[in-house]
């Protein structure tokens, strides 16, 4: 009996997923009404100091929104600033807020993180948040 129990325990530990294995985005799906506020969360990979936000639609494809390095906004040239805002208050998360949502805001919003070392940035993407505005 003891060897079988030990075998089961070993299997359980082998199947356990590591924490902080990748970029985490919440919620995965969000449905909201026109004129509401939507807040999207991103948790970068531990140790990564750069966070990027993108929006992806069928018509426009992947669009850059904003980029943070060491919590400071570096480039927000892609942000529709009248209703969109992003923050990175600490190294553990970033938020993207959309005020007064419109149907054209319906898209998949992607967050990526990077070590931010050297000249190039190898980005690791989260699963995305699918926002639907009715």
From Swiss-Prot:
GO terms for cellular component: plasma membrane; T cell receptor complex. Residues 20-115 are annotated as: V segment. One of its GO terms (biological process) is cell surface receptor signaling pathway. Glycans are attached at residue 90. CDD domains: IgV_TCR_beta (cd05899). Keywords: Adaptive immunity, Disulfide bond, Glycoprotein, Immunity, Immunoglobulin domain, Receptor, Signal, T cell receptor. SUPFAM superfamilies: Immunoglobulin. Residues 116-119 are annotated as: D segment. SMART domains: IG, IGv. This is T-cell receptor beta chain V region CTL-F3.
């Amino acid at each position: 009996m003891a060897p079988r129990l030990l075998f089961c325990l070993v299997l359980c530990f082998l199947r356990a997923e590591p924490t902080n294995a990748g970029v985490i985005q919440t919620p995965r799906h969000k449905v909201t009404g026109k004129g509401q506020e939507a807040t999207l969360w991103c948790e970068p990979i531990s140790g990564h100091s750069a966070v990027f936000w993108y929006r992806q639609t069928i018509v426009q494809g992947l669009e850059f929104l904003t980029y943070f390095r060491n919590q400071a906004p570096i480039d927000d040239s892609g942000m529709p600033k009248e209703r969109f805002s992003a923050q990175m208050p600490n190294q553990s998360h970033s938020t993207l807020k959309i005020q007064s949502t419109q149907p054209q805001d319906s898209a998949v919003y992607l967050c990526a993180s990077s070590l931010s070392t050297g000249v190039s940035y190898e980005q690791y993407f989260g699963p995305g948040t699918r926002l639907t505005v009715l």
